[in-house]
Amino acid sequence: MKLKTVSLLALSMAFPFSMPSLAQGPGSQEGWNLSVGGGLLFAPSYLGDDAYQLSAVPNIQVTYGDDFFASVRGGVGYNAIKKGVWRAGPIAAYDFGRDEDGGGPFVIAGDDTDDLDGLGDVDGTIEVGGFLEYDTRPLNARIEIRQGLNGHEGLIGELSMRTGARLVVADQPVVIRVGPDVTLVDDGYNDTFFGVDAGQSAASGLDAFDADGGLLSYGLGSTVVVPFNDHVAAVTFLSYRRLAGDAADSSLVEERGSPDQVTAGFFLSYTF
């Protein structure tokens, strides 16, 4: 089975910025750094569903100073341009697709859905593109554009902004981040995940629907990071996103799901 698309999208909402960067100041991460951990993720069983599943999800991140970064969630990227508060460079990521049976390897609670029966699997996709980031600490804004080379073969644009503060609660440092997220996609992406052709309509019972591109979703994400020491950090997150445009109007979402998507979770991370 593949790790479902919703899990990666949910993690993207949860960790738009790395946990070490949240817990430490600029320039404190030199050389190679490895963070490993995992946690619990509560999210819709697929993007657009109204039923939820609980998953135990791993989180691995590798960085080299302020140059290279790689993670399961964020893909692999390189800060090719570093000028003051600006960062820009190439990025590659992998979309693990969507299983027709609605299952996943990390699900520990919640039933598999039959909403997707007759729609077929969505194959995994290699995505390549670039990003531009503005970081003044505590304000961080990021634009990322990726093109699918196979699988959905769609174009994705993600805009995110976070601001926050470092507090001390009961002698324990706490980092709070909150801000909006917007995702735009082209016709290919939306039609792959939300379109229903004549054959799929006959097999699934859903009305046929041709999904065009545009605004996929908008929402608000929040993250609370508690760095216990230089190595261990706990992360709690909560996000809400509202599907928009043809994604919200699709027969899959209107007849079997909901445009309102909530993600919550708790993670622990250890940085070597």
Task: Please annotate each region the language model reported.
Residues 72-170, 175-177, 187-212, 243-247, ...:
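Outer-membrane pore/translocation modules
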Residues 28-36, 54-56, 66-68, 84-88, ...:
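Outer-envelope beta-barrel architecture signal
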Residues 209-228:
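C-terminal low-complexity, acidic/polar tails when present
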Residues 22-76:
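Short glycine/proline- and aromatic-enriched beta-strand/turn motifs that initiate or cap beta-hairpins
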Residues 227-272:
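Predominantly the C-terminal beta-signal and adjacent terminal strand-loop region
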Residues 1-30, 49, 247-250, 257:
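Cleavable N-terminal export/targeting peptides
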Residues 38-40, 58-64, 76-80, 130-134, ...:
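Residues on the lipid-exposed face of transmembrane beta-strands in outer-membrane beta-barrel proteins
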